[in-house]
Design a protein with these regions (language model features):
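Active-site-proximal loop/helix segment associated with metal-binding centers of metalloenzymes
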Residues: 163-239
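Short, charged amphipathic recognition helices of the HTH superfamily
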Residues: 16-34
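Conserved beta-sheet core of the metallophosphoesterase superfamily
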Residues: 229-315
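Core catalytic region of metal-dependent phosphoesterases/phosphodiesterases
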Residues: 75, 80-191
């Protein structure tokens, strides 16, 4: 059994690397034990962990390799109820430290402005999306889940704001993802006269940290994960515009992983790599642009590896196209 999680190991190396001269190893151990929830680990143990990592890292550097500290699996655009089977991720089972869900978990099909020949109940979508995410966490077994919202998720708030008085709309969250991950929700089945409570996912996995960003982007190490509402039909142009936006905002990053476009590709602009990660949904059933002569939608996802300093190891990145 491992004494520390990958995230804790990263914190150990970070603190030990920057250890001031006036701090002893006992001081470091006391600080880390407090941060890790009251552990009682000796300074000798922390020192040996750090020394072992440095030994392995130096050996890998001598071979021209870099030690992996954090493995990130980024999935976006599941568009429940059009999601792909979870066993599509079978090669990554047990190989993920952070599961990053990059928006558009729910399709919000019934409340979209697009024409539709049938409707899927928003409540049905939310219940199914919650179950899908639970199954994915159990299957992939990450240590942490980081969630951003997408333009389809934000339809929830926009629809309420358009169709309800402000006073009523203020009773509801911005997206259905808050209900799924943070707040939980009740389902009032009027036909059957039942009331069912669905606990938030954050309460179901005590050993998995759930981080709902409540934003359309987040940053992990040197990588920004984003799901904007803007769209450009040019190849990788949406990702390029996003890169310039974040640069203008003063953010420091080397990698940009973009959801939203349902395309798969990567490109280098200077020292920055931009990636469009594709959709983790069955695009044949979710064809918004049918007949509009856009490039066809692509299914895919991204698997990133970072070193102890949060720098992405590019040669170990996998951009996976599924169709």
């Amino acid at each position: 059994m491992r004494l520390f999680s990958n995230e804790q190991y990263c914190r150990i190396f970070e603190l030990c690397n920057s250890k001031p001269k006036d701090k002893t190893w006992d001081d470091i151990a006391k600080q880390l034990n407090t941060e890790f929830g009251g552990l009682d680990v000796s300074s000798s143990c922390y020192r040996k962990c750090y020394q072992y990592y440095m030994l392995m890292n130096n050996a890998l550097k001598a071979k021209g390799e870099t030690a992996v500290a954090t493995r990130i699996l980024s999935i976006s655009d599941t568009h429940v109820p059009f999601e792909l089977p979870i066993d599509t991720l079978s090669d990554y089972k047990g190989r993920v430290d952070i599961l990053q869900l990059n928006g558009d978990i729910c399709d919000c099909q019934a409340i979209s402005k697009f024409g539709k020949v049938y409707r899927v109940s928003p409540m049905e979508e939310i219940i199914k999306a919650r179950k899908y995410v639970i199954d994915m966490i159990e299957y992939v077994q990450p240590k942490k889940v980081v969630v951003t919202y997408g333009n389809h998720d934000i339809r929830f708030q926009n629809y309420l704001a358009k169709n309800l008085d402000n006073e009523i709309a203020e009773l509801m969250p911005k997206t259905s993802l808050e209900l799924i991950f943070v707040d939980g929700f009740n389902h009032y089945n009027k036909r059957e006269g039942t009331k069912s409570w669905y606990a938030p996912i954050s309460q179901l996995f005590p050993y998995v940290k759930i981080d709902y960003a409540d934003n359309w982007w987040t940053q992990i190490g040197d990588t920004i994960f984003a799901h904007p509402s803007a769209f450009s039909s040019g190849i990788l142009k949406t990702a390029e515009k996003a890169m310039h936006f974040f640069r203008n905002e003063g953010l420091m990053f080397s990698e940009l992983v973009m959801a939203h476009t349902h395309r798969v590709g990567e490109y280098y602009i200077g020292n920055t790599r931009i990636i469009e990660q594709g959709a983790f949904s069955d695009v044949s059933k979710n064809n918004y642009s049918n007949g509009q002569l856009y490039n066809s939608q692509k299914e895919g996802f991204v698997y990133l590896c970072q070193d102890i300093n949060g720098k992405t190891i590019r040669e170990k990145t996998e951009l996976v196209a599924l169709n």
